[in-house]
Amino acid sequence: MFPVFPCTLLAPPFPVLGLDSRGVGGLMNSFPPPQGHAQNPLQVGAELQSRFFASQGCAQSPFQAAPAPPPTPQAPAAEPLQVDLLPVLAAAQESAAAAAAAAAAAAAVAAAPPAPAAASTVDTAALKQPPAPPPPPPPVSAPAAEAAPPASAATIAAAAATAVVAPTSTVAVAPVASALEKKTKSKGPYICALCAKEFKNGYNLRRHEAIHTGAKAGRVPSGAMKMPTMVPLSLLSVPQLSGAGGGGGEAGAGGGAAAVAAGGVVTTTASGKRIRKNHACEMCGKAFRDVYHLNRHKLSHSDEKPYQCPVCQQRFKRKDRMSYHVRSHDGAVHKPYNCSHCGKSFSRPDHLNSHVRQVHSTERPFKCEKCEAAFATKDRLRAHTVRHEEKVPCHVCGKMLSSAYISDHMKVHSQGPHHVCELCNKGTGEVCPMAAAAAAAAAAAAAAVAAPPTAVGSLSGAEGVPVSSQPLPSQPW
């Protein structure tokens, strides 16, 4: 497209420009260059062009750009809103930091033990007086009111403060609460005897104990022999042990375990497994792994037999023994355990083992401390130890018996429902309390008069007078 000039150029270009037969040279001659100018081709061309358009009635060359309008003065830019919010944001951050510090201090105070109560120094009379009214607020001047930020700025500032404070306070308080929860939480009642570390179950405890001992934790084979654990009687004074037998609570299982294990109660089986027995008997010092077995063991120290057979009225100390006895009345007792020596059958494996030790075995591991006798079972050793105890006479027949068997011997004189006691004149099938008291008094008198007879020759009295000895009477068993 050709530019449209402000002047009318309807004539052919050559006559108008004077470019007829004379050519460009004629045009140059019609507009001679001005005098005093340097012969610069560009300047000469520009002057010729301006003269040409001036002769044609154009005030300005169409090829020259219009002069740019003068710049209009602009109003100074208003300060951005962020400049006004800088003090508000700074105050919000300071308040968030103060809130986080206050939350951390409150958590530390809650975790610390309570301090002993001190004497109060607060004036209670002053507390009962009504509080003084607050001072009136200072008047607000008009320029200050005009200088207040607009509502939109206040809304944005409040939103910014809320967005800054909420996450900061949550992040500051959450780690403190989680740390306190981890510190106070207990893992379990299984405690390592060497480093006091707690575990939830016995398997994890055994795996941990393998680190201290170097032994590989594993299952105990079925044929492994468990060695009995004896607790020193000095440990019975520990509060955890004395309460473990009666209550059986979790406190005795937790705190008492560490105390007993430190005293050497942890035993090791033939396979290398360590067994902790926390509950000790107060009478003999034998330890057990739980309260159930301890209470069952305590029945052996008493004459109580709470379980009675409904068929023959025979009494038992343990319920399982009574159940096996009741099955014998029906003739349906299954005895799968056979002795390889004599072919005798038993209903329980412990009965078979006891039979083999007592009848067929020549090993005598239980030895008497007062003589050279040895026995295959602990029960037989206990029965033999009674021979070395003090003898008491029977008030009926005068036979000298041990104090442990005097009650059983009195039943010999009171067998049958038609027996009449010589002391109370009552017919009874049990031991008379008056007869038992008389036997105890006679035993005390006999012990005060003379020393108990022994199987060794004769003994010397307190004043050197020999006391005649008599042979030991036959035992009721």
Curated annotation (Swiss-Prot):
It is found in: Nucleus. Residues 130-141 have a biased composition (Pro residues). This is Myc-associated zinc finger protein. InterPro entries: Znf_C2H2_sf, Znf_C2H2_type. It comes from the Eukaryota. The modification Phosphoserine is found at S361. Residues 59-78, 121-146 are annotated as: Disordered. Transcriptional regulator, potentially with dual roles in transcription initiation and termination. GO terms for cellular component: nucleus. A zinc finger (C2H2-type) spans 190-212, 279-301, 307-329, 337-360, 366-388, 392-413. Present in kidney, liver and brain. In the brain, highest levels are found in motor cortex and midfrontal cortex (at protein level). SMART domains: ZnF_C2H2. One of its GO terms (biological process) is positive regulation of DNA-templated transcription. Interacts with BPTF. Keywords: DNA-binding, Metal-binding, Nucleus, Phosphoprotein, Repeat, RNA-binding, Transcription, Transcription regulation, Zinc, Zinc-finger.
